[in-house]
Amino acid sequence: MVYEHGGDVYRNKVRLDFSVNTNPLGMSENVKKAIAENIEQFGIYPDAMCVNLRNAIAEKEQVGADNVLCSNGAAEMIFAVVRAVMPKKTLLLAPTFSEYERALKSVGSQICYYYLKEKNDF
């Protein structure tokens, strides 16, 4: 199996990796503090419906909690949206994040590629 997802900093000397959604500056001190303050929660299986998280995001963004979707990452959300929409035909920019193509192929969508040109600083 070919490893197609980005973030392989173990085999590739990468300074800034734009193929994954990670913070190039590392974890913030606020996140480290929140983890330390809630370490006892880490042994509890998380709420699959993300009720508290969705409510907190909804309150902060002033929207209804029903308008907030949570996932374990971009790839999971991409696959979920593609499964919900089930597009028969899709226009996909290339090059792009590999999970778009994988998700579309998983539902049998006919993919039409629009290739960006490097000479135009895609």
Regions found by a protein language model. Give the residues of each.
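PLP-dependent aminotransferase-like
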Residues: R83-F122
